[in-house]
Swiss-Prot record:
Keywords: Cytoplasm, Protein biosynthesis. Responsible for the release of ribosomes from messenger RNA at the termination of protein biosynthesis. May increase the efficiency of translation by recycling ribosomes from one round of translation to another. Belongs to the RRF family. Signal peptide: none annotated. One of its GO terms (cellular component) is cytoplasm. One of its GO terms (molecular function) is ribosomal large subunit binding. It is found in: Cytoplasm. The gene is frr. This is Ribosome-recycling factor. GO terms for biological process: translational termination. InterPro entries: Ribosome_recyc_fac (IPR002661), Ribosome_recyc_fac_dom (IPR023584), RRF_sf (IPR036191).
Length: 185
């Protein structure tokens, strides 16, 4: 019983770290990756569709992305979605492709993005701690109901604390890497 609770908690913690990785990937650094377009949704035949499903991306320069829609009729919709997104870029359309030139990140904008990254990391840490709290409550309930002994309960809590520390450390490492990416010019 306790092992099942620990396994479920670790799976949820792993998911929290995965969400943090995705959040960090969507924060722009000095070099552009297609991941910055991850949250951009295009109104495609009435359905919000991620731009990454509608187009290919080519990065000829560190600050330029060329978007080539698979369906040429969606060119205008893709351009509009990119323009309306919070990426801070003005796409140009030449009839077959869309060019997006990203401005150089100012020092202030870099600091703002570091704050955003720290906020995302803290959200992940809180999520991991909440998972720990729920798992600890479940372990306490198992011990209280007599389904496991107190020694087994303490061992389970110790394992849970180790897992919590391990996953929080992963989030901290992801944050450290993202901060160094953002602050390197």
């Amino acid at each position: 019983m306790i092992d099942d609770t620990l396994l479920e908690a670790e799976e949820k913690m792993d998911k929290a770290v995965s969400v943090a990785k995705d959040d960090f990937a969507n924060i722009r650094t000095g070099r552009i990756t297609p991941a910055v377009f991850g949250k951009v949704l295009v109104d495609y035949y009435g359905a919000p569709t991620p731009v990454q499903q509608l187009a290919s991306f080519h990065i000829p320069e560190p600050r330029m992305v060329i978007i080539t829609p698979y369906d040429k009729s969606s060119l205008g919709a893709v351009e509009k979605a990119v323009r309306d997104s919070d990426l801070g870029v003005n796409p140009s359309n030449d009839g077959t492709i869309i060019r997006c030139v990203f401005p150089e990140l100012s020092e202030q904008r870099r600091r703002d993005l570091v704050k955003v990254a720290r906020t995302k990391a803290e959200e992940a840490r809180v999520s991991i701690r909440n998972i720990r709290r729920h798992a600890k409550d479940a372990i306490d309930r198992i011990v209280r109901d007599g389904e496991a002994g107190e020694d087994e309960g303490r061992r389970g809590e110790k394992d849970l604390d180790e897992a919590t520390h391990r996953y929080v450390s992963q989030v901290d490492e992801l944050l450290r890497i993202k901060e160094s990416d953002l602050l390197s010019v």
